[in-house]
Amino acid sequence: NDWTLMIVTADVSGKGVPASLIMAEVRASTQLLVSMKVGLVELTEKLNALIHQSTDKKSFVTFFAAEINPVMRSISYVNAGHPPPLICSNGAVSPLSRGTFPLGMQALLSGLTVRDAAFQPGDFIVFYTDGILERTNPQGEQFGEERLAGYIRKNARSGVGPFVEQLFAEVEKFGEGRDPDDDATVAIIRFV
């Protein structure tokens, strides 16, 4: 409806042209299915079937889709193997549900359910890909969800632009100049 915002974050295993082609297929299919007004579970199940049929079974896609209703102050979401977004409310940071297997790994997704969460003005959600969590330093340590949650708590009052810029700088600093093993994406939704 007019009051609902949909956000999707996804990440394809692998690199290069094959991964790019899979992501293009996911993006186009998601846009088509959303325009057909399918629900979150049906959207995810149809994408899973498509990816399972059209890939080599070694490729998979982590996928998180959410419908945000600012009037009801609610978020409904499904998670297929994607790192759970972190919601910050009054300085407390907690993950949304981890969900089920990534898309394409199995012909049918078992245990896929719509979850719900509420938010208040001032809360925000951080959506990200595993390139943030899996950034390693020379000692082999990963940046991880705990460091990310700590960063969110420490910088909760920052504007969205500076928050994201500083997060990437923090992750880069943690890597101590090493090239990242994976790309990274971050998106923020702040509720007013």
Model-derived regions: residue spans:
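Conserved subregion of the PPM/PP2C metallophosphatase catalytic domain
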Residues: 1-13, 17-24, 28-192
